[in-house]
């Protein structure tokens, strides 16, 4: 059978600036990042929020989503729409063998790549800094992770609730001198 990558409508026109952007709320005013091309492999909130700010400031952002889309697409909230306006989107199964050609073309095209995987995941998917910068040495690579790239908890998934708990925020709920209450 044909993999998801082979089914993607991927034209040379795209790489000549012929993108279509949904929910474009930019104006013709101050756009200091105009002309900068961002390849966004991130999902949920931290990475998409960072690239949203770049898009609002004029950068062209291409959001790379897995088959089925960014996890935030399926949440019943404004999270996805609110953090992904002014971006183009493409579906790529990064685990598929034929994804390599698309990844290569994205790396050649982009000025910046951003991902939000736990350490080691991007390398396994073929989108790590060494892999992409071998294609485009000028590519700026941004890696976001909840607990850094090294250290004892670096491989743990980073989410808001974990940060609140580790900072003692959850212990604040309840009565003084009693065990914390559960929600």
Question: Language-model features: where?
Answer:
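N-terminal helix-loop segment corresponding to the beta1-alpha1 unit
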Residues: 7-183
């Amino acid at each position: 059978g044909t993999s998801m990558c082979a089914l993607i409508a991927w034209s040379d026109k795209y790489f000549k600036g012929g993108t279509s952007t949904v929910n474009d709320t930019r104006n013709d005013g101050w756009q200091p990042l105009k002309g900068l091309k961002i390849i966004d492999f991130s999902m949920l909130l931290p990475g998409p929020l960072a690239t949203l700010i770049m898009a609002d400031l004029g950068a062209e952002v291409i959001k790379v989503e897995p088959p089925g889309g960014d996890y935030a697409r399926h949440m019943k909230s404004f999270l996805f729409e609110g953090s992904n306006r002014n971006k183009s989107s493409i579906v790529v199964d990064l685990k598929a063998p034929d994804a390599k050609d698309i990844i290569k073309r994205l790396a050649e095209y982009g000025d910046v790549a951003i991902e939000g995987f736990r350490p080691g995941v991007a390398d396994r998917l073929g989108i790590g800094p060494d892999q992409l910068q071998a294609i485009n040495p000028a590519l700026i690579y941004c890696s976001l992770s909840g607990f850094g790239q090294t250290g004892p908890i670096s491989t743990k998934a980073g989410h808001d609730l974990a940060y609140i708990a580790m900072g003692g925020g959850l212990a604040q709920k309840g009565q003084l001198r009693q065990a914390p209450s559960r929600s």
